[in-house]
């Protein structure tokens, strides 16, 4: 869990965040239910901040900032409901609600952890999602990132995502310094993301 330090960015990108972090959340949820504590694991540096990484890595038109081996399609992430449950920050679910409104039934059918949203999100009010306050977010770590946007509720908003770091992290590419620019609903510049493993 040290890879989330210090600010919550995940070095392998947003898709591998979903895969790896979902196992962390399931484990922490299980031991907390069984023993009444997670033994401080959720308090490790950066871990409770990593939900903000996913929140800010999604563009106004619900695309991912795809660097390393990651694709550009945003996805429903049930683990974000775990972060809501732990932090009680309703704004962390903003993009999740937008994704569900767009084509939620299809997304839920394809997600093995969708039932966990019912448990972790039981107290969430999803009818009117709380808009996040911060228009920018940055994180240090193995692959530092920075995300900026002009608005949360305007699909024509300007959005910029930037990635620094190292190509030697797991699933890394030679993409240090890559960026994504979205404005007026158009992706003007982006990292092409990952290729198929078998090519």
Predicted regions: what is each one?
Residues 1-12:
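Acidic/His metal-coordination segments adjacent to aromatic residues that form catalytic metal sites
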Residues 8, 65, 195:
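Flexible, active-site-adjacent loop/turn segments at secondary-structure boundaries
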Residues 12, 17, 197:
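Short, electropositive, low-hydrophobicity segments enriched in small/polar residues
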Residues 16-189:
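Carbohydrate-active enzyme catalytic cores, enriched for enzymes
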Residues 189-199:
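C-terminal, non-catalytic macromolecule-binding modules
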């Amino acid at each position: 869990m040290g890879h989330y330090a210090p600010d919550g960015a995940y070095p392998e990108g947003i898709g591998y965040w979903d895969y790896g972090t979902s196992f962390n959340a399931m484990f922490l949820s299980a031991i907390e239910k069984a023993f009444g504590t997670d033994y401080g694991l959720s308090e490790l540096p950066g871990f409770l901040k990593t939900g903000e990484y996913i929140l800010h890595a999604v563009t106004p038109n619900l695309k991912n900032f795809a660097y390393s081996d990651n694709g550009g399609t945003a996805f429903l992430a049930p683990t974000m409901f775990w972060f809501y449950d732990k932090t009680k920050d309703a704004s962390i679910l903003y993009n999740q609600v937008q994704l569900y409104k767009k084509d939620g039934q299809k997304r839920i059918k394809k997600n093995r952890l969708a039932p966990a949203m019912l448990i972790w999100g039981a107290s969430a009010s999803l009818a009117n999602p709380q808009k996040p306050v911060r228009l920018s977010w940055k994180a240090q770590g193995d692959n530092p990132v920075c995300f900026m946007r002009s608005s949360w509720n305007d699909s024509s908003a300007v959005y910029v995502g930037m990635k620094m770091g190292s190509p030697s992290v797991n699933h890394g590419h030679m993409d240090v310094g890559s960026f994504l620019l979205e404005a007026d609903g158009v992706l003007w510049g982006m990292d092409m993301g990952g290729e198929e493993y078998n090519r």
